[in-house]
Swiss-Prot record:
One of its GO terms (cellular component) is cytosol. This is UPF0246 protein Bcep18194_A5551. It comes from Burkholderia lata (strain ATCC 17760 / DSM 23089 / LMG 22485 / NCIMB 9086 / R18194 / 383). GO terms for biological process: response to hydroperoxide. Belongs to the UPF0246 family.
Length: 260
């Protein structure tokens, strides 16, 4: 079983890492190619391209200037500890044991506009480059064209080491990021967990809660060493419960109704 997550825009390089082990990203050469292109942009160009504030554009202008093909704990941090958004609050990697993180290293992958595909312990230098950014390169008009089928092939290398029910990809990423994966080329079926909360008289996806729940699901898989997708139906964290009637073989729906 492989779980894919989206990255986070918010990063934490202040909290010391509680594990010393780390690995190097697989697609450093590709990331370096993107950085070379990003370095040609002015802060104003970056602000316009990414629709961000001038201070944030200047910050990322400097990040691109500082970025190096040499990754060390001095200039980088393990990805799953550096990302700090809603998904990663749910995953809460800083409270996972070393054994849990070792398991996550084999089963969790993070999709990234700059790095392509990251393992949890891959060192991450700070950046901002969302997968949906229309940043043209020699490979095409945007990052989906840039990455092509590279991410899918890398996932297949991992999926092909699994067998039986364990050969499955659990999509806990956003639509924007999962578009970088080509499901028809995957060597495994895809299961997408969907999290809905009751609001305004009906169940609906509420972004903040759904993002956190994706992280909770990834943690549930890691802590329980789940390999059979049927066991995903037992997920019942923070009030969510599997809804068989709303689900099918490729979409597992979890619903929560609180505060009434």
């Amino acid at each position: 079983m492989i779980i894919v997550l989206s990255p986070a825009k918010s990063l934490d390089y202040d909290t010391p890492a509680h594990v010393q082990s780390y690995t190097k990203p697989a697609f450093v050469d590709d990331a370096s190619e993107l950085i070379d292109g990003l370095r040609k942009l002015s802060p104003q160009d970056i602000a316009t391209l990414m629709d961000i504030s001038d201070p944030l554009a200047r910050l990322n202008f400097q990040r691109y200037a500082d970025w190096s093909t040499t990754f060390t704990p001095a200039n980088a941090k393990q990805a799953v500890l550096a990302f700090n958004g809603d998904v990663y609050e749910g995953f809460d990697a800083k409270s996972l044991s070393s054994a849990d993180l070792d398991y996550a290293q084999q089963h969790v992958r993070v999709l990234s506009g700059l790095y392509g595909l990251l393992r949890p312990l891959d060192l991450l230098q700070p950046y901002r480059l969302e997968m949906g950014t229309r940043f043209p390169t020699a490979r095409g008009k945007d990052l989906y064209a840039f990455w092509g089928d590279r991410i899918t092939r890398a996932l297949n290398e991992q999926l092909e080491t699994r067998s039986g029910a364990a050969r499955v990809l659990v999509n806990c990423a956003s639509t924007e990021y999962f578009k970088s994966v080509k499901p028809k080329l995957l060597a495994a079926p895809v299961i997408t967990p969907v999290f809905e909360d009751w609001k305004g008289g009906r169940y609906k996806i509420i972004s903040f809660h759904a993002k956190r729940a994706r992280g909770l699901m990834a943690r549930f898989i890691v802590e329980n060493r789940i390999t059979d997708p049927k066991a995903l139906k037992d997920f019942a964290t923070e009030g969510y419960a599997f809804d068989a009637a709303a689900s099918n073989d490729s979409t597992y729906v979890y619903r929560r109704r609180v505060g009434e």
